[in-house]
Amino acid sequence: MMLRRLHHPILNPHTNILSVRYMQLTAYMLFVVCPLAVHLLELEDYDKRCRCNNQILLNTLPIGTELLKPIAASESCNRQEVLAILKDKGTKCLNPNAQAVRRHINRLFFRLILDEEQRIYDVVSTNIEFGAWPVPTAYKAFLWKYAKKLNYHHFRLRW
């Protein structure tokens, strides 16, 4: 008659070795692999915080631009960005130092209006503040000069 050893799974001598290896593997995963994966994901997320990474910055507004979205420099992205939201809900990155982009953003701060009662062109502040964009004093001075020119040309007013 052949003798067979009946092993209970808990009392199996191989189980102890496997459980120690399993515990070592688990400890390795917890202390080495998981922090490394979290660190790599944080670096990947850090690159995505700047919305215009590795994209060509356009110097003019693309056709079909619905609105402009200036984004301030912050801790996660150290540069100022301007996004153009298109009518088809796409986005394009614009160069915030380009003249065409600055002109469109500056128009949000000051307006040149015609006061019908006094028959005079005047520069009016819109009181809009962007954290991402300083108030353009040079643009305001340009509008004042242009208003003076229009007032002289249309109404022969001198200041």
UniProtKB/Swiss-Prot annotation:
What domain of life?
Answer: Viruses
**Keyword check for Transmembrane helix:** no
Example of a GO cellular component annotation carried by this entry: extracellular region
Assigned keywords, A-Z: Disulfide bond
InterPro entries found in the cross-reference section: Chemokine_IL8-like_dom, CXC_Chemokine_domain, Interleukin_8-like_sf
Q: Name one GO biological process term.
A: defense response
What are the annotated disulfide bridges? Answer: C50-C77, C52-C93
One Gene Ontology term of the molecular function aspect: chemokine activity
**Keyword check for Amino-acid biosynthesis:** no
Pfam (any one): IL8
Entry's family note:
Belongs to the intercrine alpha (chemokine CxC) family.
State the name under which the record lists this protein: Putative viral CXC chemokine 2
Q: Which organism is it from?
A: Human cytomegalovirus (strain Towne)
GN (gene name): UL147
